[in-house]
């Protein structure tokens, strides 16, 4: 079929450019240092291409995205990068893909309780680093980690998203450093081996 014969609307991917982008990002963040976000591509085929390049850890914004990745066998290390209080959805995810390693973001006692009730075993403490959307204030990160551990959860570390800086045109590098300093401070309170942050718009500025 020729491209002009495709029914529209149609999503067309230039595989040569895609592979070049994967290789470029992988050179900066090799292997599991890069955690691709499923909401950006919503395709298990593309996820498999990333996994074949060594990027076997993924995150998603919804329970459904994680379930889709796990169903495709891409379940080594999945992060639900969103705070969920719907216990039923969490329980359905855990029960549906029992072999998957699933980590959930938490930022409050309520989300910690939901994680426990939903059968989640591991969490990251989500920290607000400048974008007023979600995440605890950095000074509360240690307290929340203690609460999560007291409830029997494994706390793997912290996550934060400097989304407000993705298109910043003035002093982006300095502002990214400020945001990441908040995340690193929170990690100092929380511990763990994961510090998750960054995005396409700031990846060249993140050197932590």
Where do the model's predicted regions map?
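Active-site loop/helix belt of alpha/beta enzymes
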Residues: 120-122, 128-208
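A generic, well-ordered mixed alpha/beta core segment in the N-terminal half of proteins
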Residues: 79-80, 86-133
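Distinct, well-ordered alpha-helical segments
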Residues: 46-50, 70, 89-94, 112-120, ...
């Amino acid at each position: 079929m020729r491209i002009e014969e495709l029914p529209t609307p149609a999503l067309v991917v230039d595989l040569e450019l895609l592979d070049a982008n994967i290789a470029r990002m992988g050179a900066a963040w090799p292997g599991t240092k890069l955690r691709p976000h499923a909401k950006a591509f919503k395709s298990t085929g593309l996820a498999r291409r990333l996994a074949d390049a060594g990027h076997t850890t993924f995150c998603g914004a919804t329970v459904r995205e994680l379930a889709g990745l796990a169903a495709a066998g891409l379940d080594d290390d999945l992060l639900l990068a969103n705070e969920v209080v719907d216990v039923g959805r969490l329980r359905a995810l855990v029960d549906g893909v029992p072999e998957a390693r699933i980590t959930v973001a938490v930022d409050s006692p309520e989300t910690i309780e939901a994680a426990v009730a939903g059968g989640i075993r591991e969490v990251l403490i989500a920290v607000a680093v400048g974008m007023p959307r979600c995440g605890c204030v950095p000074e509360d990160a240690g307290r929340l980690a203690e609460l999560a551990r007291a409830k029997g959860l494994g706390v793997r570390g912290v996550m934060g998203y400097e989304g407000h800086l993705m298109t910043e045109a003035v002093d982006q590098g300095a502002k990214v450093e400020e945001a990441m300093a908040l995340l690193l401070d929170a990690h100092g309170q929380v511990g763990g081996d994961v510090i998750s942050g960054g995005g396409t718009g700031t990846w060249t500025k993140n050197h932590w």
